[in-house]
Amino acid sequence: MHGFMTLFKKEILRFWKVAFQTVMAPVLTALLYQLIFSHVLSQHVEAYPGVSYTAFLIPGLAMMSMAQNAFANSSSSLIQSKITGNIVFLLLPPLTALEFFAAYLLAAVVRGVVVGAGVLAVTSWFGLLLPAHPLWVLVFAVFGCGVLGTLGIVAGIWADKFDQLAAFQNFLIMPLTFLSGVFYSINSLPPLWKTVSHLNPVFYMIDGFRYGFFGQGDVSPWLSLAVVAGSFALLAGWSLHLIASGYKLRQ
């Protein structure tokens, strides 16, 4: 437990010491999205009955920012440690695979939640959102960050250089987040693309998180929870296997 806490604190300090880059920058990016899309589309789109498009955007942008930053936190830390050789100082102490995994995962969740809170704070002047179901908001915030944080661990272990990690982000994370209903309700899509959206686990994170605010979504929150929790379990098992085997860490 002492080893876990030490590594966890180290990961928290790693992103907090450069909070202007790791927290404020993504919050500013989300604010710009909010300004542009709400200005252009707020008078033309009503995603949910009785919910303005401006309000509709806020939870989606918050969850998108949380997911992207949870992934970035764990993946960038691991790849940086591997490239600089500092990973050896994490492998020498008697850390179990579970402690190693939990420290990186929880730090990623913390960064994601902090960024999400910042996005909600700066966009609140567009229309203060009071969650209809706060527990759903909390559950999907934690699980959403958990899924992408775990995927970040897998990517950080797999990648040998920053170019490979960038490809992972550009060709997997970016499409999954942008095509997940952040800027639209999938009920507005043609049948084919609606079906494709249902295959995207990030869609369920965003829809469940949005349900917590408005009490309505494109699918049942219980279905969203099942998909997100199942995705987390699969990725966590894969990540723990990679850590325990020493794949690209001890090899």
Where are these regions (language model features)?
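Alpha-helical transmembrane segments and their short interhelical loops
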Residues: 97-169, 216-240
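Transmembrane alpha-helical segments of integral membrane proteins
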Residues: 202-214
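Transmembrane helix-boundary elements of multi-pass transport/secretion proteins
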Residues: 14-81, 128-134, 167, 188, ...
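Transmembrane helix segments
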Residues: 41, 156-199, 203
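Hydrophobic alpha-helical transmembrane segments of multi-pass membrane transport proteins
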Residues: 28-37, 53-123, 152, 171, ...
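A short amphipathic helical element positioned immediately N-terminal to and/or at the very start
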Residues: 1-16, 209
